[in-house]
């Protein structure tokens, strides 16, 4: 029997607008973000606070989460998802969306699925970041040569603590046997009821 599990995939990123009233967190306008290509996150923690007595470390207050960065690589955002995470205004009559002073990037909740394998058995784990704020999106593109050069989009978001009583910055779901079951956990958390 394997002692651990190996990560074999990432899929189905979802996003929703975050709001909080007191310590009650809620989400609206949830939707599929794009098709997932790669996901990673880095966190910064405070230093451990050690107390010494009788010439030894007698007590320890472990470091806690301070901040983090979520990096998502996706195939490419559709207009609705880009407008949501970038806080963009309604398009002009000419169909143009203005990035400018009227833009207000909102806090969002983000969820996606990591796939694992252990002893030949596949499992799926939902990952949820209850409050993030996306950075302005940088883009690049290259002309097609002899073959298609598949070009992806990089998204970066600041990981923040939710305003719930626990000040949660991440949720990890139980392992489930199907991707659909993991997806259902994310959609329920983010208040997404449509298909």
Residue ranges and their predicted role:
Residues 46-55:
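N-terminal "mature-chain" segments and other terminal, solvent-exposed stretches
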Residues 74-78, 114-118, 133-136, 159-163:
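Beta-strand elements of well-folded, non-transmembrane domains
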Residues 58-82, 149-162:
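Oligomerization/assembly interface segments of phage tail-like spikes and tubes
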Residues 1-41, 195:
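Polar/acidic, low-complexity leader/linker segments enriched in S/T/G and N/D
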Residues 62-63, 99-103, 118, 141-151:
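Exposed beta-sheet edge/beta-hairpin loop segments within beta-rich domains
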Residues 132-195:
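Mixed-charge, glycine-accented linear interaction segment located at domain edges/termini
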């Amino acid at each position: 029997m394997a002692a651990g599990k190996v990560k074999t995939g990432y899929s189905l990123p979802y996003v929703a607008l975050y709001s909080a009233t007191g310590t009650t967190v809620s989400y609206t306008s949830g939707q599929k973000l794009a098709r997932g290509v790669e996901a990673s996150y880095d966190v910064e923690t405070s230093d451990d606070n050690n107390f010494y007595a009788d010439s030894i470390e007698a007590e320890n207050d472990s470091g806690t989460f301070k901040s983090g960065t979520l990096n998502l690589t996706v195939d490419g955002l559709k207009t609705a998802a880009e407008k949501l995470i970038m806080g963009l205004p309604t398009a002009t009559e000419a169909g143009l969306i203005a990035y400018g002073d009227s833009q207000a990037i909102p806090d969002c909740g983000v969820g996606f699925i990591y796939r694992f394998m252990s002893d030949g058995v596949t499992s799926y784990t939902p990952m949820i970041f209850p409050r993030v704020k996306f950075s302005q999106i940088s883009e690049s593109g290259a002309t097609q040569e002899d073959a298609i050069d598949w070009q992806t989009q990089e998204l970066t978001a600041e990981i923040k603590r939710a305003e719930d009583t626990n000040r949660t910055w991440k949720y990890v779901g139980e392992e489930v046997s199907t991707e659909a079951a993991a997806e259902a956990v994310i959609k329920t958390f983010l208040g997404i009821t449509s298909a």
